[in-house]
Amino acid sequence: MNSSTALAHISEDGLRVQTVAEHLQSTAKLCEHFANVFGAEQAGCYAGLLHDIGKYSAAFQYRLKGGPKVDHSTAGAKEAQLRGQPYIAFTVAGHHTGLPDGGTRSDTDAEGTFLGRMKRKIDPYSRWESEIALPPSPALPPFKQRYELAFYTRMLYSCLVDADYLDTEAFMDDTPPPRGGGMTVFLLSYKS
């Protein structure tokens, strides 16, 4: 592993590393698997691939060496938003802090709302484009009611949070990530 490789995680003993690309790909596979239950596997994969691209920034790499905390989720949310995926953007933006309030166009970049965060200037993270190939943007299912869209976003969010947590936990424990578990097992048992 060369010194310019972007890292997502370092084991507590400092002997093992997980690259950002490895983490994004593993999380994407898990999120795709979980989201398949409600027909959103493409969106799950997309969210998993984008969720931590902010870890490619120099500021985050410095964080791994003891630097200050850094917002690494806004980068992926911005990329999803630029690609016409606002529901994935909400999901990615909140994968550590909870789904953000939407906000208003008058929100400033200092505010924690979704629209405020989309105005933030963030550290460059473009190295992701040479390591991660995004699939075509997923189509949004045809929703008849607004609550369906809200429910879809919350389900996708849950899939991403679980996938991210499970992949990170598996790396830290040096075990393969589990397939399913928790709410996924519950949903699969009731799938018609």
Regions found by a protein language model. Name each.
Residues 1-191:
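Accessory nucleic-acid engagement/destabilization modules that flank
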